[in-house]
């Protein structure tokens, strides 16, 4: 258990290092308004904090920097969400000022604004298509055995999927198929489309369309691939280049290479709990992120969690500001999407 004096010194060291990216010495601490005790006391307390593993030496300076353990203690016990400026709030609210008609635009704007306001990299995991309801479907033939299915959802999302038929399909049959699907499936959740087609719509297809079973199975396979698609939206992918920790080209190249691997990034969201979660340094799953922190917030439609927003920055990131921004963006995004889905 740290004493109040040690807590204060640790907090000031973390805050000063976040601001300056320079190791913090006892002389710097003695000039801080909040610290009123002697230089000797400061040095003794810093020595104790170092022995306990909360701060550590650097090779190039006599000052100290927070260790991962120090950051973790700071985040768990000393951190409070930063109060945002009026300008910050206006920028966030401007994303959602007008009624949102397309989910992708709201999510992509959220990612971009977060990266702009933090100067870090932001990632938004969009809701799966399965969360949407069908508004309209079109099937456009492009070759005798190939067509493109265009699904339009209630959130404005447009999904294009190629359908490969094992045999040539009559154009009039495709037209009948589209009419029946739109008549019977409008408003049905995307996740239920395949089931509804095979259990209910098949009766109508059977009586109106030749080779209906061939068409049906090809369409079913296409819908399966649509439902399972996770979508990632990025902002500020190369913002890490602005951070002094990433002036090492090899280090930043490995991180940027990881960010380009969509399946690897999706793993970062696999066990996301509701609310705000913070992973620091080696707590992250990847070696490329051992000098990074990842702060994640969830967003909802009504009470249902449907996606996540994350900010990746150096372990020296401004935790207070990022948490404050994530809380506001996730809250506003949740309200906008709830309105969009309910509408």
Curated annotation (Swiss-Prot):
GO terms for molecular function: DNA binding. Keywords: Repressor, Stress response, Transcription, Transcription regulation. SUPFAM superfamilies: GAF domain-like (SSF55781), Winged helix' DNA-binding domain (SSF46785). GO terms for biological process: negative regulation of DNA-templated transcription. NCBIfam families: hrcA. Belongs to the HrcA family. Negative regulator of class I heat shock genes (grpE-dnaK-dnaJ and groELS operons). Prevents heat-shock induction of these operons. This is Heat-inducible transcription repressor HrcA. It comes from Bacillus licheniformis (strain ATCC 14580 / DSM 13 / JCM 2505 / CCUG 7422 / NBRC 12200 / NCIMB 9375 / NCTC 10341 / NRRL NRS-1264 / Gibson 46). The gene is hrcA.
């Amino acid at each position: 258990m740290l004493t109040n004096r040690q807590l204060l010194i640790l907090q000031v060291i973390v805050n000063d290092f976040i601001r300056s990216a320079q190791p913090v010495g006892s002389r710097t601490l003695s000039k801080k308004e909040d610290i009123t005790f002697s230089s000797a006391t400061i040095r003794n307390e810093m020595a104790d904090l170092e022995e306990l593993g909360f701060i550590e030496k650097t090779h190039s300076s006599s000052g100290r920097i927070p260790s991962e353990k120090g950051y973790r203690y700071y985040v768990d016990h000393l951190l409070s969400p930063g109060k945002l400026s009026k300008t910050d709030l206006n920028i966030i609210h401007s994303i959602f000022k007008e009624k949102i008609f397309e989910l992708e635009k709201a999510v992509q704007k959220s990612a971009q604004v977060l990266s702009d306001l933090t100067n870090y990299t932001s990632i938004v995991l969009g809701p799966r298509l399965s969360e949407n309801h069908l508004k309209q479907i079109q099937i456009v033939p492009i070759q005798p055995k190939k067509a493109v299915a265009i699904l339009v959802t209630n959130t404005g999302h447009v999904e294009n999927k190629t359908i490969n038929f094992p045999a040539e399909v009559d154009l009039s049959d495709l037209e009948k198929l589209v009419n029946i699907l739109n008549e019977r499936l409008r408003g049905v959740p995307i996740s239920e489309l395949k089931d509804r087609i095979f259990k209910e719509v098949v009766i109508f297809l059977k009586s109106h369309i030749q080779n209906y079973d061939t068409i049906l199975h090809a369409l079913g396979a296409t819908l399966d691939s649509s439902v399972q698609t996770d979508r990632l939206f990025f902002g500020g992918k190369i913002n890490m280049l602005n951070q002094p920790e990433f002036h090492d080209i090899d280090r930043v190249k490995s991180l940027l290479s990881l960010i380009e691997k969509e399946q690897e990034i999706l793993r970062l969201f696999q066990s996301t709990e509701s609310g705000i979660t913070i992973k620091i340094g080696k707590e992250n799953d990847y070696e490329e992120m051992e000098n990074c922190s990842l702060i994640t917030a969830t967003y909802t439609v009504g009470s249902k969690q449907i996606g996540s927003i994350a900010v990746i920055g150096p372990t020296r990131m401004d935790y207070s500001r990022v948490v404050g921004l994530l809380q506001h963006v996730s809250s506003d995004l949740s309200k906008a999407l709830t309105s969009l889905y309910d509408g």
